[in-house]
Amino acid sequence: MSEPIMSHSESIEINASAETVWSLVTDMERYGEWSSENTGGYWRKNEEGIPGTGAVGDEFVGINRRGEDEWKALVEIIDRKENQTFAFVTGGTAMNLIHWRYDLEPNDSGTTLTESWALRNLSPLMIENGDEEVQFRAANARESITATLQGMKAAAES
């Protein structure tokens, strides 16, 4: 895989088991409780009409808001290792825009949770608005990662 255009990751120590943290990381419908941008979302139904559950290949529609702007973003689950790794890509594997990844590492006091963001390809909006949009999205991702990690920590430790 090629190097990302830009990337960022942060970690947080959580005083909870990997299983507890995993239950939050994989509950994408709850991301709106923690994210500074995402307000929730829903699993898309497969060809049999059954909503996804977070398996590799399942698709989730995230609902996002920034100021007055609201939009939906399709993501596809690309990696899932129970209590270890959960990753998805914005735009699905076809567009391969932004990779989001959560890695869980058990330790003596609980779990280290790392969230990573990697811009792989530019969206039409990023191309249209140029570097200013790219830098804005990167700053927004950093803010969202911090908020999400802190929110998940609070939820896991409560």
Give short role names for the model-derived ranges.
Residues 2-3, 46-47, 72-74, 120-124:
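Short hydrophobic/aromatic-rich motifs at helix boundaries and adjacent loops
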Residues 89-147:
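Beta-strand/loop substructures that line and gate deep hydrophobic ligand-binding cavities in soluble
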Residues 19-22, 146, 150:
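Amphipathic alpha-helical segments that line or abut small-molecule/effector binding pockets
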Residues 11-15, 76, 103, 118:
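Generic structural detector for well-ordered beta-strands
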Residues 38, 84, 120:
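Residue-level detector of flexible, active-site-proximal loop/helix-junction positions
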Residues 33, 44-93, 109-112, 147-158:
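Glycine-rich portal/gate segments that line the openings of hydrophobic small-molecule binding cavities
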Residues 7-9, 70-74, 96-100:
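Short, surface-exposed coil-to-beta transition loops
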Residues 1-51:
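Hydrophobic ligand-binding cavity/cleft-lining segments
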